[in-house]
Design a protein with these regions (language model features):
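Short beta-strand-centered aromatic/proline hotspots
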Residues: 89, 126-135
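Short, charged beta-turn/beta-strand-edge "cap" motif at the junction between a beta-strand
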Residues: 118-123
Length: 177
């Protein structure tokens, strides 16, 4: 029992580092997609930011083979679109070219999905369009996702009334009732 308590701060510190890295990579992917795929001109500050981030990610580690990733390691909870529903999983590894998610079942290579991740501590949610680049069967399965589209980073809040409201603004809230 004592051993698990000592390990807890290390795990939360590691997860904090992963979230910071994800935040940086989402900004890199956003600028890269806007510049390369969408043809949207970047202003001077954004061009400098993209070049700086490119230097950072180019110097980072290469993606590890799926066989070397420990699926029992604690990850960050995520959701993936799969067929007509959602698939829960955990983000296990993260590089600028790939995200590795452990899930109950694999997704076919080439399948396009959207990964959703929310950080309750900072109040930030990420929506990342991806394509399945590789997968490994097992329990749990490991799915390698390649970023494929414009990611979205946004803040979320809980209404002060504590009641959820339709995103279309339809219906009454607890205050109006």
């Amino acid at each position: 029992m004592e051993w698990s308590r000592e390990r807890e701060p290390w795990q939360s510190w590691r997860l904090h580092i992963v979230m910071d890295k994800l935040d940086l990579l989402v900004r890199f992917w956003e600028l890269r997609v806007r510049y390369e795929a969408l043809g949207m001109p970047l202003n001077k500050e954004e061009r400098l930011e993209l070049l700086s981030l490119l230097q950072l990610v180019a110097a980072s580690d290469d993606a590890r083979p799926l066989e070397t990733i420990d699926p029992s390691q604690r990850g960050i909870p995520v959701q993936l679109t799969a067929g007509s529903g959602f698939l829960s999983g955990e983000l296990k590894d993260l590089t600028y070219e790939r995200l590795v998610v452990a899930a109950a079942e694999p997704l076919p290579i080439g399948h396009r999905t959207i990964m959703y991740l929310a950080d309750a501590v900072t109040g930030i949610e990420y929506t990342l369009p991806c394509a399945v680049a590789c997968s490994r069967n097992g329990s749990p399965c490991l799915v390698g996702l390649a970023p494929d589209g414009l990611p979205l980073r946004s803040h979320f809040t809980v209404p002060s009334s504590g009641l959820w409201r339709s995103p279309l603004g339809i219906g009454r809230t607890g205050i109006e009732a």
